[in-house]
């Protein structure tokens, strides 16, 4: 039997990384929960996520702007968004001066 795990999503954040950091918190056959940490990153020009699973994201710190099917969506801490499977989306910008911390659930 596995033990319960207690942790904090704001502990051990990478320091001003030049790339986004993805930390898997839970993986099951049809569900994945991850912490994403960004410092000013954005999706490469012309790149779009188009995922087979729904994705729910919660912005916990920093600010972000997404493009979801051609619509600009600005996010502040506490904002969350459900992105349905097959919806093209990309990250336009994230805060560069503070960590932008996301919690993402893929199901």
Feature roles, as predicted:
Residues 1-35, 39-40, 45-46:
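A short, N-terminal "cap"/entry segment at the start of jelly-roll beta-barrel domains
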Residues 50-66:
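Short, conserved beta-strand element in jelly-roll/cupin
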Residues 70-85:
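Short acidic-glycine-tyrosine-enriched beta hairpin
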Residues 86-107:
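Ligand-binding loop in jelly-roll beta-barrel domains
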Residues 63-65, 72, 88:
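Structural motif
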Residues 30, 53, 99-100:
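A structure-centric signal for secondary-structure junctions around beta-strands
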